[in-house]
């Protein structure tokens, strides 16, 4: 019987501190389930966590007060422990909405603890707050604040945290096998050093540095300093600012501490998580301005209700017992926050971008979403599944074959609509290849003779992580990543592949980058990537007959008629397709045309080359021209004669699959196009540009040369 995986359930795992803690959990070998109702966070943070750790994470959109839904998660998965972040958390807001805070924070926790008790899960790390101490300066000897400082929170937020601490304490008193770690954190700041993850407050930021960051990029006019008449060196309040990564690691240290306790034993203990060093508001202001490179505008206003002079931690207990210590400085935090801010000036709120779940009917699974970038003229939709292009709409006209029902993409008859093809596009002879004296046998998924498009579990049938969505002045990007495991379909080595889509008002560019990661046990593999979109300028559910195609090359790889594999010869096409060629039922293509036949130019990463136009396409009745360009040495032109699925029949679309030579890895002269070793980079770029032109321009295109006609297939 297989051993069931154990999970740490993280409530509020899509939030600022929760998401950073999930990263540290996974980096320390834990499997994680996130539960979050997304009321003051968004799923994009989870997608970015997955991108950073290169692993899929189970996620459930759920309010903790939903006992039935929460219990179902505990029924389904083996939960080993819980890290509890989920809470409303704004001090000022809690003064205005006390009932909402008590209901959400306390009632949600009680429901969680009840479900845990019913499922015999008795390990909880609670993300509390230094606000439970209230104004510690009312005592002469309590700064820095020790855990023994009397508790007297001054606002509803702090009172909910203190109430939850006592609930967990009383639970342990009633059953001493419970293990509760109470982490009283001070002021988290900073962002993940990758620049991919940071605090993204919905609305006006409540915390100092996020607000200051928005001032720095022009989203806010000035910083509001709440009081400069405190008894401090510059009159502003003092706080213990801790880098969010250090804070996240403190939660791992607490969890590890609890896990070392014997199963029959329990404990309840509070720890401060802070640096032990206090900084005033102006200290932080000047540190951040130094990182930005200029002074930022600010205005001193009145004190904020509930604020106190000094909240500096004494972290000695955590240092000694948890073997944890804050290592990162204020400078580190300001640097990481500024990187996050300039790379994500609007956080996760991206103009021209929206997404929705893209699942089989009745299933709610966040690992597959449909991401749409929409400009005035061009709208492109891309799914996590296969990083596939589901729709390309230019001036309201859809130009590619695709399904609105996700389940159809999983049909056996699906001819790879819109998919990213990998790890190796097109055919591999005999389903095998040899490198460094080792023969690798692959999945033979075409007539049990050849490997086609990477095998039965190619990139087209896997869920890519991400995307990282970004906006720029006149374009948007979506970056997806996939980790293809060593041995999948027989291919050696782990492989990390980044697919980056760049969408402008009239173009879709696709960039590929693949590397063998350092952790891979093997150090060589074969790679050839492409996109398998079927284009139809007239109408995606009609035939492409009447479409006019013009290529910049007329040479192709001659193939064996029985195997569809290259003979090794590069020959001229029997009719000149560098002249406009009108498609009709007698003109069919499934051939690899050569853009660059010079072996001296073969390389793994072609991104350094300029894009070359390779194909122009029009339809006489449609005022649109498609131009395909690439850095690649070849492209497969396919007219989709064998397609027959749902509303899409034979010849419902044509493909221009840019890439390397067919079966290049089994040809000594061509193999360096596709053999990737650890430390090297495979890369490629292709672009699909769309132009509006009137029908008279189409006529000129046709008149530029007499178009070909004849039987090509």
UniProtKB/Swiss-Prot annotation:
**Task performed by this protein:** Mutarotase converts alpha-aldose to the beta-anomer. It is active on D-glucose, L-arabinose, D-xylose, D-galactose, maltose and lactose.
InterPro entries tied to this protein: Ald1_epimerase_CS, Aldose_1/G6P_1-epimerase, Epimerase_deHydtase, Gal_mutarotase_sf_dom, Galactose_mutarotase-like, GH-type_carb-bd, NAD(P)-bd_dom_sf, UDP_G4E
Annotated region described as Galactowaldenase, given as residue ranges: 1-350
- Tell me which species this is from: Schizosaccharomyces pombe (strain 972 / ATCC 24843) (Fission yeast)
Cofactor(s) needed by this chain: NAD(+)
Quote the cellular component terms of the Gene Ontology held in the record: cytosol
Q: Which UniProt keywords apply?
A: Carbohydrate metabolism, Galactose metabolism, Isomerase, Multifunctional enzyme, NAD
Task: Say which family it is in.
Answer: In the N-terminal section; belongs to the NAD(P)-dependent epimerase/dehydratase family.
Catalytic residues in the record: 532 (for mutarotase activity)
Positions binding NAD(+) in this chain are 7-38
Listed Pfam families: Aldose_epim, Epimerase
Name of the molecule in the record: Bifunctional protein gal10
Q: Which GO terms describe its biological process?
A: galactose metabolic process; monosaccharide metabolic process; UDP-galactose biosynthetic process
């Amino acid at each position: 019987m297989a051993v069931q995986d154990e999970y740490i359930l993280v409530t509020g795992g899509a939030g600022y501190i929760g998401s950073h803690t999930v990263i540290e959990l996974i980096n320390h070998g834990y499997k994680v389930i996130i539960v979050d109702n997304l009321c003051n966070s968004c799923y994009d943070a989870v997608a970015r966590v997955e991108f950073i750790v290169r692993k899929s994470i189970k996620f459930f959109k759920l309010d903790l007060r939903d006992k039935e839904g929460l219990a179902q998660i505990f029924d389904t998965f083996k939960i080993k422990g819980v890290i509890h972040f989920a809470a409303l958390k704004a001090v000022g807001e809690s003064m205005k909405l006390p009932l909402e805070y008590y209901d959400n924070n306390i009632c949600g926790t009680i429901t969680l603890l009840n479900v845990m008790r019913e499922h015999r899960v008795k390990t909880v790390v609670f993300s509390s707050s230094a606000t439970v101490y209230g104004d510690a300066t009312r005592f002469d000897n309590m700064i820095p604040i020790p855990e023994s400082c009397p508790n007297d929170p001054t606002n509803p937020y702090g009172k909910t945290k203190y109430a939850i601490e006592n609930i967990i304490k009383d639970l342990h008193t009633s059953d001493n096998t419970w293990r509760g770690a109470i982490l009283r954190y001070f002021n988290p700041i900073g962002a993940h050093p990758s620049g991919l993850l940071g605090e993204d407050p919905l609305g006006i930021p409540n915390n100092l540095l996020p607000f200051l960051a928005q001032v720095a990029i022009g989203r806010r006019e000035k910083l509001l300093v709440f009081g400069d008449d405190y008894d401090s060196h510059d009159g502003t309040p003092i706080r213990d600012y801790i880098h969010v990564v250090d804070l996240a690691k403190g939660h791992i240290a607490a969890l590890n501490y609890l896990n070392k306790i014997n199963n029959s034993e329990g404990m309840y203990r509070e720890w401060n998580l802070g640096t032990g060093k206090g900084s005033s508001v102006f200290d932080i202001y000047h540190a951040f301005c130094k990182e930005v490179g200029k002074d930022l505008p600010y205005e001193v206003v009145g004190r904020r209700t509930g604020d106190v002079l000094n909240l500096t931690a004494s972290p000695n207990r955590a240092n000694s017992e948890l073997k944890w210590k804050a290592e990162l400085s204020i400078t580190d935090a300001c640097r990481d926050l500024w990187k996050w801010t300039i790379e994500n000036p609007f956080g996760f709120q991206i103009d021209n971008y929206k997404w929705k779940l893209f699942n089989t009917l009745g299933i709610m699974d966040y690992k597959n979403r449909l991401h749409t970038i929409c400009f005035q003229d061009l709208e492109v939709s891309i799914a996590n599944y296969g990083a596939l292009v589901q729709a390309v709409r230019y001036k309201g006209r859809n130009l590619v074959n695709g399904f609105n029902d996700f389940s159809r993409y999983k049909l056996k008859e699906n001819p790879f609509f819109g998919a990213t093809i990998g790890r190796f596009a097109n055919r591999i002879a005999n389903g095998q290849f040899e490198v460094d004296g080792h023969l690798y046998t692959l999945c033979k998924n075409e007539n049990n003779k050849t490997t086609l498009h990477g095998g039965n579990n190619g990139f087209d049938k896997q869920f890519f992580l991400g995307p990282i969505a970004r906006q720029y002045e006149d374009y948007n990007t979506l970056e997806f990543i996939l980790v293809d495991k060593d041995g999948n379909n027989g291919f050696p080595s782990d492989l990390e592949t980044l697919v980056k889509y760049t969408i402008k008002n009239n173009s879709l560019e696709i960039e590929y980058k693949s590397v063998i990661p350092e952790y891979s046990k093997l150090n060589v593999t074969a790679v050839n990537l492409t996109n398998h979109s079927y284009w139809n300028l007239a109408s995606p559910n009609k035939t492409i007959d009447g479409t006019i195609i013009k290529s910049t090359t007329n040479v192709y790889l001659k193939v064996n008629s029985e195997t569809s594999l290259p003979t090794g010869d590069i020959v001229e096409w029997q009719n000149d397709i560098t002249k406009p060629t009108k498609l009709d039922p007698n003109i069919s293509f499934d051939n690899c045309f050569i853009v660059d036949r010079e072996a001296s130019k073969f390389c793994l990463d072609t991104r350094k080359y300029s894009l070359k136009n390779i194909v122009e396409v029009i339809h006489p009745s449609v005022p649109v021209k498609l131009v395909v360009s690439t850095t690649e040495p070849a492209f497969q032109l396919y007219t989709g004669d064998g397609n027959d699925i749902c509303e899409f029949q034979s010849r419902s679309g044509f493909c221009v699959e840019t890439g390397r030579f067919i079966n290049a890895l089994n040809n000594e002269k061509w193999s360096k196009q596709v053999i990737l070793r650890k430390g090297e980079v495979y890369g490629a770029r292709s672009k699909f540009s769309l132009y509006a032109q009137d029908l008279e321009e189409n006529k000129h295109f046709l008149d530029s040369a007499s178009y070909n006609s004849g039987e090509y297939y």
